[in-house]
Amino acid sequence: MASVTAAMVKDLREKTGAGMMDCKNALNETGGDIEAAIDWLRKKGLSKAAKKSGRIAAEGLVAVAVHETDGVVVEVNSETDFVARNEEFQALARTIALVAVEKGLTDVEALKGAHYPGGSTVAEAIANSVATIGENMTLRRVAAVNVAQGVVGQYVHNAVADGLGKIGVIVGLESTGDAVVLAPLARLIALHIAAASPLALEAADLDPAVVAREKAVLADKNAGKPPQVLEKIVESGLKTFYKEVCLVDQPSIHADHANKTIGQVVKEAEKAAGAPVKLKAFVRYALGEGIEKQESDFAAEVAAAASGQL
């Protein structure tokens, strides 16, 4: 069994909103497994967490670049937030995104080996910035969205400069319709994605393991019900889950689209666009998601509630 630490309790609290002692008990009951502890809390009705989430801990920037019908998002990490405000680092992240979109690269290693303006490779440009700024930097990931016809919309949240920030989104609308209609629609959807953080475009795109996990939680929460009743409860619960995590089923956050799902908003735009519109794909990067930093400032609260030790 893994030893339960203060950092683990803090992490679980941030992911679930549950009380400290509930988090401690959950971790003890699940052998220190964070994901199992999340499910344990949900089954006990102590957490509202509905989907897997990663704590935002790394620093750096997410960069977005769009060229005609192609868009990319890249994440470049640094050691401190201070570097994210450095103009050289910002130029580096922005240029890497431009290289990726111009060359159509979605593999990190291929992007590192790509030509960087000035005669070096992307990897060499990063190394040069490390030497100049004096802080380690990493090209962590890159992803793209492309459409044959239509538009790719973008949105950057907490922007520190054009196309650079803490959350970056690109979304593709496949259509032969009027770009004057499609472009603002794509941006509104990108903004929605940044705020609502969907896991997939639609239910069929969800990881089967995520769906199976949700079914298990619903079944455990309603254990003891007759099989026929339980089946309906699980089915209803999954529909609610899909509305929370599938883009086309999510209620739009925009006041102009009140009581409409994103799927309905896109469908209704077809008349103004003059052609069918397909929501093809999206990418949402939040800076540092899935990367953990060690924490050492939680001891006081633990000491007060658990006599100094977990």
Curated annotation (Swiss-Prot):
It comes from the Bacteria. GO terms for molecular function: translation elongation factor activity. The keyword Ribonucleoprotein does not apply. PROSITE patterns: EF_TS_1 (PS01126), EF_TS_2 (PS01127). It is found in: Cytoplasm. Gene3D superfamilies: 1.10.286.20, DNA helicase RuvA subunit, C-terminal domain, Elongation factor Ts, dimerisation domain. This is Elongation factor Ts. It comes from Methylocella silvestris (strain DSM 15510 / CIP 108128 / LMG 27833 / NCIMB 13906 / BL2).
